[in-house]
Regions:
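Beta-propeller blade termini and top-face loops
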Residues: 26-209
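N-terminal secretory signal peptides that target proteins for export/translocation
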Residues: 1-6
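Bacterial N-terminal signal peptides
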Residues: 8-20
Length: 209
């Protein structure tokens, strides 16, 4: 009887071990499944250069992009249709857009594109929406000219960082990295190298930001 029990327990542990190994193997997707995937245009037609793109946490269908010639655009159907959500509030060149992870109704947009070329257009600071792009208000850094990236704290939508390239045609003291802790009402310059060195990107450590 003891022999049967031992064999039974041995079989149980072997089954558990094999099942666990199978589950671990299933967690790693086979790279070959992506071989057939092809890029496709999702619009909008003549939307201009897309200088900033972001998704919405918890939604696989909602996205925003910052157009260098047409403001901020939004889709809620994975790119089948797009709508300009900045018309009537601001327009022209936009270089950055970010959606809060903790409150997806909060969206920040930054003016001016970061792709330096002969015919770039500057922007007029940061804009903020509290209703997922339906309405917008100014949120500071009006003289920043070219905002390259916006990053929002993962748990506090009032804490936001801006990478500012500044005026690309001349030395400019409005360059570097800026931080706001009150939703864009006030900004503090937290990194400045020189008036000829701007910031073009930002990555946040969620535990130290």
């Amino acid at each position: 009887m003891k022999t049967y029990l031992r064999m039974g327990w041995l079989g149980f542990f072997l089954t558990l071990l094999l099942t666990s190994a199978n589950l671990q193997a299933q967690e790693i997707p086979d790279p070959k499944i992506y071989d057939a995937v092809q890029w496709r245009l999702v619009g909008p037609f003549r939307g201009g250069r897309a200088d900033g793109v972001t998704g919405v946490k918890g939604s696989g269908h909602s996205y925003y992009f910052a157009s260098t010639g047409g403001g901020i655009w939004k889709t809620v159907d994975s790119g089948r249709t797009w709508k300009s959500v900045s018309d009537g509030f601001f327009g022209g060149s936009m270089g950055a857009v970010a959606v809060s992870e903790s409150d997806t109704a909060v969206v920040y947009a930054g003016g001016g594109e970061k792709t330096v070329r002969g015919n770039v257009s500057f922007g007029y600071g940061v804009w903020k929406s509290k209703d997922a792009g339906k309405t917008w208000v100014r949120a500071g850094l009006d003289k920043s000219r070219f905002i390259s990236r916006l990053r929002i704290h993962p748990t506090n939508p009032d804490v936001v960082y801006a990478a500012v390239l500044g005026d690309i045609f001349k030395p400019d003291a409005t360059r570097g990295v800026f931080k706001s802790v009150d939703g864009g009402k006030t900004w503090e310059k937290v990194l400045f190298v020189s008036d000829v060195a701007g910031a073009v990107d930002l990555v946040l450590d969620p535990k130290k930001s």
